Amino acid sequence: MNLEETMPLVFERSIPGRIGFSLPESDVPETKASDFFEEAYLRSTPADLPELSELEIMRHYTNLSNHNFGVDSGFYPLGSCTMKYNPKINEKVARFPGFANIHPNQPESSVQGALELLYDLQTSLVEITGMDEVTLQPAAGAHGEWTGLMLIRAFHEKNGDTKRTKVIIPDSAHGTNPASAAVAGFDVVTVKSNEKGLVDVADLKKVVGEDTAALMLTNPNTLGLFEKDIVEMAEIVHAAGGKLYYDGANLNAIMAKVRPGDMGFDVVHLNLHKTFTGPHGGGGPGSGPIGVKKELIPFLPTPVLTKKEDAYTFDYNYPDSIGRVKPYYGNFGINVRAYTYIRTMGPDGLKLVTEYAVLNANYMMRKLQAAYDLPFDQVCKHEFVLSGNRQKKLGVRTIDIAKRLLDHNFHPPTVYFPLIVGEAIMIEPTETESKETLDSFIDTMLKIAKEAEENPEIVQEAPHSTYVKRLDETRAARKPVLRYQKEV
């Protein structure tokens, strides 16, 4: 398709009377919908569904897919998102009939194999995180954050400590952290970062108090830097009666090397769709389990999967539970994929994942620091943050650099985050990329930096080769059009 052409919507391709699929004749008596539903629920006009042949539908969606980009398409260095390769064996296992064809309403006795998998996954995550118990119920990361904070809230309320209304969050935190805290009913207090990009412990001491419910931390943080004072921070928060919450978005940097529970964290959420290779992007599904220390176990969402003698069962006898946070028992298919990954890799393999993720990030950072500003020049973990301030002085902004990368078949890194870095470029290569891929991306970034100096217009006007050019992203966010409406 020519880049100048506009691809019609599937509704706009519709030709009245065209058939895509013919159903066999019914072998049961025909009944009328009016025999079962009141008139108010019956359509007065036919549904305006597109009418196309099977071939037309196939070509339409194949063409759309060719304009998409995913991890299987190319390098996807989206910082803090861990866009690693999703092994296809995960997909095969998730499609085993014993997993794909069961239903959560079946009797427990008929799904013991599935329950055993979930129980073993919980056990593995307990070991990886250093927690005492794990629930797989939350649907994704932010949902896990909210669930963990609700547990902390329930804990304080159970102890009559209702004055603890504030959650402390670093100024470098993921945006979901303050959002989750607010939805959970807490007030958000910001703790500053110091000149090294780490939490300012002196400032933490100032903001911690009798009203502190928790401190939320990502470690390593969103700058890719390990919070070396974490043990001291845990002691400060615990001495004040608060809890320490671990945002597991960056677990890929420390997995099988160090455990959040050993650092002093009381609650942790994980992103199985990131660290443990469940495919993500496009709205899900995800999986956001939370792990807790012993004194928070009574507040876990019910039901809690347990093992009694030789059988696996759901336990609803948790009187202090915050209640169910999702229908049924979590996103089972993603949990199967994560379990497959953990069993495939084993402890030594997971340790290598961390080592290669950190090695790749440091290699790229050192290769790029001559052409881009490096606000925090120190060894990073799984990701690092550059600044495009140097290019901005030449009239080229970070968004221009991101768009120019599209012309070279690279997905852009995360941009303009974390907020404490001007013109931020946040790069996370993950462990699954080859040195050749890393070098190709590095060469492209160096080329774009040179273009910013010698031919800024080509960067400012990018992308040049994509089907869709620059969108009005502000309007798309504020006035989204989410469904087709036929013009009359």
Curated annotation (Swiss-Prot):
Family, similarity comment: Belongs to the GcvP family. C-terminal subunit subfamily.
Gene Ontology BP term (one): glycine decarboxylation via glycine cleavage system
HAMAP family documented for this protein: GcvPB
PANTHER family: GLYCINE DEHYDROGENASE (DECARBOXYLATING), MITOCHONDRIAL, GLYCINE DEHYDROGENASE, DECARBOXYLATING
Reactions accelerated catalytically: N(6)-[(R)-lipoyl]-L-lysyl-[glycine-cleavage complex H protein] + glycine + H(+) = N(6)-[(R)-S(8)-aminomethyldihydrolipoyl]-L-lysyl-[glycine-cleavage complex H protein] + CO2
Gene (UniProt): gcvPB
Keywords annotated in UniProt: Oxidoreductase, Pyridoxal phosphate
Domain of life: Bacteria
Subunit structure: The glycine cleavage system is composed of four proteins: P, T, L and H. In this organism, the P 'protein' is a heterodimer of two subunits.
EC id: 1.4.4.2
In-chain residues carrying the UniProt-annotated modification N6-(pyridoxal phosphate)lysine: K274
Protein name in UniProt: Probable glycine dehydrogenase (decarboxylating) subunit 2
Organism per entry: Listeria welshimeri serovar 6b (strain ATCC 35897 / DSM 20650 / CCUG 15529 / CIP 8149 / NCTC 11857 / SLCC 5334 / V8)
Job of this protein: The glycine cleavage system catalyzes the degradation of glycine. The P protein binds the alpha-amino group of glycine through its pyridoxal phosphate cofactor; CO(2) is released and the remaining methylamine moiety is then transferred to the lipoamide cofactor of the H protein.
GO cellular component, one term: glycine cleavage complex
